[in-house]
Amino acid sequence: MGESEIRKAAEQFTQNKVGIVEGVMGLFDGANPDDDQGSTMEIARLLQWSVLLVVDASHAGRSIFASIRGFVEEAGPGAIVGVILNRLGSEGHETYLKKACAGMEI
């Protein structure tokens, strides 16, 4: 699918200017291992869409901060506008991860 077809499909399916698009595999996974071609990130950049990153936080501790920071840095300034921590184990786990990620600027 070319750029014009992608833009046309996006316009058709986001009539209210809001859309939720689920990527395949990971945010940067596409046709090539060394660039964004065919990835969800390529589409987001093409359409100038913000990314809300959903992260599986099960069995995660402070290291999740480094993982999220890597995504934010790879995406570039302003591309990722928020993070949802999914599959939290408990309220204590949520509190712990919020503290671990508190210094992150998104």
Outline where the language-model segments fall.
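ATP-dependent carboxylate-amine ligase catalytic core
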Residues: 1-47, 55-82, 91-95
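GTPase G-domain guanine-specificity segment
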Residues: 85-106
